A protein has these predicted regions:
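A structured beta-alpha segment of the ubiquitous adenosine-cofactor-binding alpha/beta core
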Residues: 62-86
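Predominantly a Rossmann-like dinucleotide-binding segment in NAD(P)-dependent oxidoreductases
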Residues: 17, 130-135, 140-249, 349
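Glycine-rich phosphate/pyrophosphate-binding beta-alpha loops
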Residues: 252, 270-280
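Beta-strand-loop-alpha-helix segment that lines the small-molecule cofactor/substrate pocket
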Residues: 83, 89-90, 94-142, 156
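N-terminal Rossmann-like dinucleotide-binding module
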Residues: 1-57
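C-terminal helical cap and adjacent loop that interface with cofactors, partners, or active-site loops
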Residues: 24, 277-409
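Active-site beta-strand termini and strand-to-loop segments that position acidic
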Residues: 258-264, 288
Length: 409
């Protein structure tokens, strides 16, 4: 599957998971005039509501599969489905993606793509054996700032890259203790794992900036976590006596910091916190020999461009705006989805399939970006010892071409 393109077609899409995230993706797909032919969820009412969205968009009623947690298998045996969107709790991502590929379907899977190193290898080997794609739906790679900075990097404005930093800093305490949506399953992850549980929102754009697995590769990481305090404090303040959640023991440190070294010597910091008071922030920093960019708020400093030692905004660099944002930006903003990046991501996925192009992020990226979570857990458990990255490309990272998202419309 190295460098392979999608089979050119107008895809017939099935979505597994029609909760909050699945229906958000569905809405954007319908605006992009995607064919949605089947929907699956363990809650029949959610699948029915998603089906009504499809009909309202002028398409025929999609087939619904709501007969338990394994009914997706029955759905994926249908011959008229050729692209599957997986938007379910994390532990289901790998088995659903693998089953879909074995049934001859390309897959686009929500983040984190998979959760263990074995699953990373499983999706790579299944993709190679079946000839089907497994793309990570990392929407943050399609943000306006991220795509603009990526094109500036490829124009040489940052010089040789040296350092990047990404993060997922998001106060999810209320959501984690909700009796609906992600509160039904995501909090459980905090009882099982201590590391960076959700790395790719911050890491994905930085990996694209640096050409990771396309001329460079992750070598090793060290990771450390603070004590866990936030969920205990929130629970004490908000739950009543007798609530069964009071018996849960949380082990995920409130802030995890992981430091990655690449084979070329570049360094990357990746941070994660969802259990403390914090404004939303992905940091999105990249530094090179000619300048530096930080996000939240967006600010840039390029050698010879600033009159004093101070940052400036990025408006003057609008000529590097990505072609997708030039042509689809207004539609993207009107349809929401994290500032429009969700729409751009799905529009681009459809574009790649319809034009027979390779995916911007392939199964090797899905595996490498997802591997941060289990590797960070290993390092934390070993006293922050260095942990080596597997080479999911089996040595081919040095000759793979740069992802087309950097240049293509």
């Amino acid at each position: 599957m190295m460098g392979a393109a999608f089979a050119k077609r107008d895809p017939r899409i099935a979505i597994i998971g029609t909760g909050g995230r699945g229906t958000s993706l569905l809405g954007n797909l319908l605006v992009a005039k995607a064919q949605v032919v089947a929907l699956c969820d363990i809650v029949a009412e959610k699948a029915q509501g998603a089906g009504a969205m499809v009909v309202k968009a002028g398409q025929k009623q999609p087939d619904l599969f709501t007969n338990g947690p394994h009914d997706f298998e029955r759905m994926l045996k249908l011959s008229d489905i050729d692209l599957v969107i997986v938007a379910t709790p994390w532990l289901w991502h790998a088995p659903m993606a693998i089953f879909a590929m074995k049934e001859g379907k390309d897959v686009a899977v929500e983040v984190p793509g998979v959760t263990t190193i074995q699953e990373c290898w499983d999706i790579v080997e299944t993709s190679e054996h079946t000839g089907k794609h497994c793309m990570i739906l990392e929407n943050c790679c399609y943000g306006y700032n991220e795509t603009l900075i990526l094109r500036m990097i490829h124009a040489g404005l940052f010089g040789e890259l040296l350092y990047g930093e990404g993060a997922y800093l998001h106060d999810l305490r209320e959501e984690l203790f909700s009796n609906a949506g992600e509160g039904l399953w995501r909090r459980t992850e905090h009882t099982r794992r201590d590391g960076n549980l959700y790395p790719s929102h911050g890491l994905g754009p930085v990996a694209n900036y640096m050409g990771i697995q396309r001329g460079d590769t992750f070598s090793h990481l060290v990771s450390m976590s603070t004590p866990q305090r936030g969920l205990d404090i929130y629970r004490k303040a908000h739950l009543k006596a007798g609530d069964p959640r009071n018996a849960e023991k949380y082990i995920t440190g409130d802030m995890n910091t992981s430091l990655i070294k690449t084979s070329k010597g570049l360094t990357i910091t990746v941070k994660h916190t969802v259990s403390t008071p914090h404004p939303y922030d992905r940091i999105n920093q990249i530094a090179g020999t000619k300048g530096i960019f930080y996000d939240y708020p967006a600010r840039i400093y390029l050698d010879g461009q600033n009159k004093d030692e101070s940052f400036e905004g990025i408006d003057k660099w609008k000529d590097h705006e990505h072609p997708l944002w030039k042509t689809e930006g207004e539609i993207a903003k009107q349809n929401g989805g994290h500032g429009g990046m969700d729409y751009i991501m799905l529009y681009r996925l459809l574009q790649c399939v319809r034009e027979g192009l390779p995916p911007d992020m392939d199964v090797y990226d899905t595996a490498a970006w997802s591997s941060i979570a289990p590797l960070s857990e290993m390092s934390v458990s070993r006293g922050s010892a260095p942990v080596q990255f597997p080479d999911f490309t089996r040595g081919q990272w040095s000759s793979r071409p740069i992802s087309a998202i950097a240049t293509q419309a």
